[in-house]
């Protein structure tokens, strides 16, 4: 892959506490989210505890607000928080780079979620080049009532489809470095869109709604189905958010 990644002000909350008894106890506010080794938070914490032979146990509570299976790296962000939290809690002294090397074993997006900010991601997503902050803008996020797995997104990926808009990554990098918001937006694209939108037309409806209500551009995030719209004005974004809520196309 080759893509630009950017953190936004949307987050889950992970609370971590030591306990005398060995083992990891993970709880969450979402009933269908697993709380064993299938959960990336559990997997990340266990990896560090096994490596450093930590005898104490952990109690972790995960309050999820980022939608599940939404193409927003929510699970990867949670795993990154577990790496950072366990490192601090037990005073392991691992640097950010050392955490990132371990994080890729849990998931391709996890090293970026440890680093955060604006970055060019290559390889499977683990080769990261830090970039200057994206030019200041407002981002509206809407998730329709469907879930799309990464596996489904890749199964429906047709790179030779004329409808596929290939992003100009080099042009985006230059625009970001120059603080050129319009230049960045004009070079954006998501190759997953045609395959996913053909299965879930509501994604296109959300894009159209955002763009007809002031977004410079609306696009699917990652493998979808979440859509984000970029605005240069908060009032425009707030009005678009109200219209989106009324439409009930997305949350």
Task: Give the ranges of each region predicted by the language model.
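ATP-binding N-lobe of GHMP and related small-molecule kinases
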Residues: 1-70, 88, 92-97, 134, ...
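Solvent-exposed alpha-helices and their adjacent loops that cap or buttress functional pockets
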Residues: 6-7, 104-105, 111-114, 130-135, ...
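Residue-level signal for inorganic ion chemistry
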Residues: 14-16, 41, 75, 109, ...
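Short, basic/glycine-rich phosphate-binding loops at helix/coil junctions
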Residues: 20-34, 82, 178-188
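Contiguous, small/hydrophobic- and glycine-enriched helical/loop subdomains that border
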Residues: 57, 83-120
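Glycine/serine-rich anion-binding loops at beta->alpha junctions
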Residues: 61-90, 108, 216-231
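Conserved, helical-rich catalytic subdomain that frames metal- and/or nucleotide-binding sites
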Residues: 115, 120-217, 232-235, 242-246
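Conserved short beta-strand edge segments in small beta-sheet-based binding/regulatory domains
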Residues: 248-251
């Amino acid at each position: 892959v080759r893509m630009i990644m950017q953190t936004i002000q949307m987050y889950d909350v992970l609370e971590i506490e030591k306990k005398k008894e060995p083992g990891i106890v993970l709880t969450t506010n979402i009933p269908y989210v697993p709380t064993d080794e299938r959960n990336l938070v559990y997997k990340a914490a266990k990896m560090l505890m096994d490596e450093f032979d930590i005898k104490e146990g952990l109690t972790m509570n995960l309050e999820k607000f980022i939608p599940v299976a939404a193409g927003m790296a929510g699970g990867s962000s949670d795993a990154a928080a577990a790496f950072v939290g366990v490192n601090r809690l037990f005073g392991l002294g691992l640097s950010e780079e050392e955490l990132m090397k371990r994080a890729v074993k849990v998931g391709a997006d996890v090293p970026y979620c440890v680093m955060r900010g604006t970055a060019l991601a290559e390889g499977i997503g683990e080769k990261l080049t830090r970039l200057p902050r994206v030019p200041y803008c407002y981002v509206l996020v809407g998730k329709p009532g469907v879930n799309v797995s990464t596996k489904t997104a890749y199964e429906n990926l047709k790179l030779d489809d004329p409808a596929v808009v290939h992003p100009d990554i080099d042009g985006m990098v230059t625009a970001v470095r120059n603080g050129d918001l319009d230049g960045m937006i004009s070079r954006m694209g998501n190759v997953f869109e045609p395959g996913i939108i053909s299965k879930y037309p509501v994604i296109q409806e959300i894009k159209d709604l955002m763009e007809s209500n002031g977004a410079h551009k609306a696009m699917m995030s990652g493998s979808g189905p979440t859509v984000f719209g970029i605005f240069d004005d908060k009032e425009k974004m707030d009005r678009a958010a109200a219209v989106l809520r009324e439409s009930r196309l997305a949350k």
